[in-house]
Amino acid sequence: MNTPTPTQRTWYRTTIFNVSVVAVCAFIAPGLWAAMNGLGGAGSADPYYVNAANAVIFCLQVVVCVFGSSLIAKIGLKWAFALGMVGFPIYASSVYCNVKYNNSWYIMLACVIDGICSGIFWLTEGAIVLAYPEKHRRGKYLAYWLASRIMGQMIGGAVTLGVNAGNQEEGHISVQTYLVFISIQAIGPFVAATLSPPEKVQRSDQSKVKINLPAGLKAELHAMWKLLGRTEILLLLPMMFQSVFSEAFFSTYNATYFTVRSRALSSLVASTCVIISNFLLGFFLDWRRLSVNTRAMAAFIIIYAFELSLYVYAMVVNKEYERQEPRPLFDWTDDGFGRAVCVYILMLVGFNLMYDYLYWLIGTVNRDGGDIIRLSAVVRGVESAGQAISYGINSVDSFLLSSAVAVNLSFFAACIVPSAFVIYRVGVVNGVKVHHIQQDETLQTSGEGSHDIMDANGKSDD
């Protein structure tokens, strides 16, 4: 077999192929998981019990994200990623049993299994999408990855809509819908097994993927503590926590105010809007006519202004619905459906824009590519803590959705100032706003507090 030349790469070792593997897995696993939960409580008639079960998943993910890197060191990134895919079809089957047989114990057992497996998945997936791409293409690859996850939600919504189009009542979706999800998710581990190990990935710019695996648990915990001591990471912790906090709210909102077929339709339309908006953001974040700092600041201002106005809008709408007796239930043929569904669609768009931006920002401020697994562990661990609390709150049926909006808004406001301190200094080296950050090098601290470096012209070589 001929050894590839610098201009000739083996197709299954390329960045695009390996990011595509992650994208397909994102479609199969969290994408279809989000498709079920986007219907409200995984499509069940009682979203509150499923929300409580989901809170268990995210609590376990926090623990796994702290200790999971040691497992990755033992079995490798590739096989840890494949192992992480195992829990998703088990979770889907438990919801199926809950809906069809009113079986409660299995869903809790499945949540324990899925919490451990998905914790490994979140940890490895985050490390791969941050470490594998060339930095000047990271925005596009992040958009591609997130679009694939949303594509899972969109196709899941289309399947659900097709199966449940005649259901104008509230309640759970058709049990046949879950069988489709289970069948697709079952192939996930086999797809994940086609991933290339980081040392074998062949980037277009010939740079190497740099990931440091921990030597032992004690050393890893020490390195994690050291990472958490970095100022920029500490300041971004509130943003990591808040970025996913709204998921439980808009999922419960969809289950509360819409018929089964309207829930499926809103999930389908929202997913389409998210894919378009994420790609627009990804191309903007990679637009090198503007400096890194200008892109970071502009995206931050636009996304946060959009999110703030959206929370106010959601509060007004939910307060209005909570005053009505009986509680409104919208079908797509009803007056007021458009206004009600806009809250769900816009919340999903804002959620994913924030998520895309967070990962681009984390990749940009990352000081050393070798720290990417523990950095992913921090991000995913804090995210899971936020989701555990959020789903726990929304599992209480007496907790008003307007109160959930208020809690979301409080966390949103709390993360603005610390995040702004980091974003203000992103891409600034010795007082100069650079257009490119070099890939996977130990970065030097500038007088402005940044950890970015640039080449002689402040731009990159493609």
Swiss-Prot record:
**Is Transmembrane helix there in the keyword field?**
yes
Q: Does the keyword Transmembrane apply?
A: yes
**Lipid bilayer topology:** Multi-pass membrane protein
For this protein, the record's Pfam families field holds: MFS_1
What keywords are assigned to this protein?
Glycoprotein, Membrane, Transmembrane, Transmembrane helix
Stretches that traverse the bilayer: 16-36, 55-75, 79-99, 104-124, 143-163, 173-193, 233-253, 265-285, 297-317, 343-363, 404-424
Which Gene3D superfamilies does the entry link to?
Answer: MFS general substrate transporter like domains
Biotech applications: Notoamides have been shown to exhibit antitumoral activities. Notoamides A-C show moderate cytotoxicity against HeLa and L1210 cells with IC(50) values in the range of 22-52 mg/ml, but the IC(50) value of notoamide D is greater than 100 mg/ml. Moreover, notoamide C induces G2/M-cell cycle arrest at a concentration of 6.3 mg/ml.
The record lists glycosylation at 102, 254
Assigned protein family: Belongs to the unc-93 family.
| Functional summary from the UniProt entry | Part of the gene cluster that mediates the biosynthesis of notoamide, a fungal indole alkaloid that belongs to a family of natural products containing a characteristic bicyclo[2.2.2]diazaoctane core. The first step of notoamide biosynthesis involves coupling of L-proline and L-tryptophan by the bimodular NRPS notE', to produce cyclo-L-tryptophan-L-proline called brevianamide F.
- What's the protein called, per UniProt? Notoamide biosynthesis cluster protein O'
